[in-house]
Amino acid sequence: MEAHLIFGPTSTGKTSVAIALAKRTGFPVIVLDRIQCYSQLSVGGGRPSAAEFQGTRRIYLIEGSLDEGVISAERAHECLVAAVEAHKPEGGVILEGGSISLFKRMAQSSYWNCGFTWHVTRLHLGGEEIFLAAAKKRINQMMQPDEQGNSFLGELVSVWKTTALRATLEGICGYRYAIEFAGKQGLEMDALTSLNRRQLEQLVHGMAHEYLCYARQQEQELPLPSLAGGEGPPFQ
């Protein structure tokens, strides 16, 4: 089975690379991301829009509710294996993402060591200025309503209303900074949807730097890919 693995830090273009490859091969993209499993956080979690799919197939490990808690790395790995097995008759899959915990679980599993011909694309964190510019562009887009009317701040305000989910939001990059920003500014959470221009610029700036910190963590902690590629283990 052909297995195309595309991974690396946040905001390095993994999704666009995966979509382009899916258009060329016809293989489905299986998303190696635990937060994208939840449509309640589709914008902040980084789910591309239907238009961005460009007719390709994008498969999430589950379609869950945050009320059940964020899926564990162990459970996510079980779902990933099941998704790959389900698509074996197609001859290939594209695995795309950057979840540190899920990739570490993959690296521990012998499942991936045989039966696959690997094509590995490891995207890397570039210069700080380039990353921050790309991150700010992405975040500014997230602040605008998408075709379904969803925006990053709208998602945050909506989910925050459920007290039991607040700890979950506080543990997710981006949402965490926005929550801290509201506290430091003395704002009620609802007020985040009506920030003035200066406040919005401050929020975007801070979120971009939080993304940079997370990207550096991913750069350091994601498993090293196999140098050979082809058959055998995908990681060193």
Curated annotation (Swiss-Prot):
<dbReference type="InterPro" id="IPR027417">
    <property type="entry name" value="P-loop_NTPase"/>
</dbReference>
<keyword id="KW-0203">Cytokinin biosynthesis</keyword>
<keyword id="KW-0808">Transferase</keyword>
<keyword id="KW-0614">Plasmid</keyword>
<dbReference type="InterPro" id="IPR002648">
    <property type="entry name" value="Tzs"/>
</dbReference>
<dbReference type="GO" id="GO:0009824">
    <property type="term" value="F:AMP dimethylallyltransferase activity"/>
</dbReference>
<keyword id="KW-0192">Crown gall tumor</keyword>
<dbReference type="Pfam" id="PF01745">
    <property type="entry name" value="IPT"/>
</dbReference>
<comment type="function">
    <text>Transfers dimethylallyl groups to AMP as part of the biosynthesis of cytokinin phytohormones.</text>
</comment>
<dbReference type="GO" id="GO:0009691">
    <property type="term" value="P:cytokinin biosynthetic process"/>
</dbReference>
<protein>
    <recommendedName>
        <fullName>Adenylate dimethylallyltransferase</fullName>
        <ecNumber>2.5.1.27</ecNumber>
    </recommendedName>
</protein>
<comment type="similarity">
    <text>Belongs to the isopentenyl transferase family.</text>
</comment>
